[in-house]
Amino acid sequence: MKIALTNFMAISFMLMSANLWSVNDAKITSHEFPKVLSEFEFFIDQTKQLPVENVHPYELITTLFSDYSYKSRFIYVPEGKEGSYQKDWVYDFPVGTALIKTFYYPVDERNLDLGSNLLETRVLLHKETGWEAVSYAWNEEQTEAFIKIAGKTINTSWVNHEGVSRDVRYRVPNMNQCKECHSTNDVISPIGPKARNLDKDLVYRGKKKNQLAYLLEQGVIDSIPKGIQAVADWEDDSVPLQDRARAYLAVNCGHCHMPSGVANSTALYLDFNAVSYTHLRAHETREDLV
């Protein structure tokens, strides 16, 4: 199965109207992690990645490269609460928020109807004590994902769009490894859902709509800043090369290579706003970077 955003959103909206499912808020804020992913009750159908009401699929303009894996992203914010806009950083989401990301490979990129192989689902949970991250690895039957505190290696394969079979030793990270990317000033934090990386159009109920506008309507965020400088899609050949390069480096490297990141001692800053010759080791302006 190709877990297409537009398809499962259409299905989930129909199912949501029945209002029969809800997230288990207590599991998100508990001091202990559930042993299996289903205990959170994020999905109507876990295998098909169909979310329950108030668990919203979302996409990023430019995404982290992860050994060619595909990803499905979801966000849950407790009812009556919203994420607050923060300039140049992710929205400040309230306690009880869950960010969910499932990694998978299609069986064959040339025919996505042949299905997919779910590998892991990572969850980032905002508890009273702060954000905590943990990974769940899917079983071979694709019916459940089990907590992996110490991580796991998964041997898998897939056929790419050129018809070449690729073997992958996929690594599910342990809990300490999550901190390597999600650590800002030595505190775990989300790194993906920044306004500038969410500012794109998606299809909702058959109609195109700006993603930020949708999240605002759904009460996930409290505002949309004016004059957003959206990141470039690094795979879009119509965009200037320097903008694509900056977007790729910012998303793949900038969360560590910034003043508050774990690689700050290198003084090589690659976050989106870095323009200093000293920190970029390049030219003075963004336009001359590449």
Q: Where do the protein language model's features map onto the residues?
A:
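Extended surface/linker regions that mediate inter-domain or inter-protein docking
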Residues: 64, 71-79, 85-247
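Extracytoplasmic/secreted proteins, especially bacterial periplasmic and envelope-associated proteins
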Residues: 32-35, 244, 248
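Periplasmic/extracellular electron-transfer cofactor-ligation site
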Residues: 175-191, 251-270, 276
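Bacterial N-terminal signal peptides that target proteins for export
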Residues: 1-9
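Conserved small/polar residues in nucleotide/adenosyl-binding loops
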Residues: 278-287
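N-terminal pre-domain segments of enzymes
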Residues: 23-72
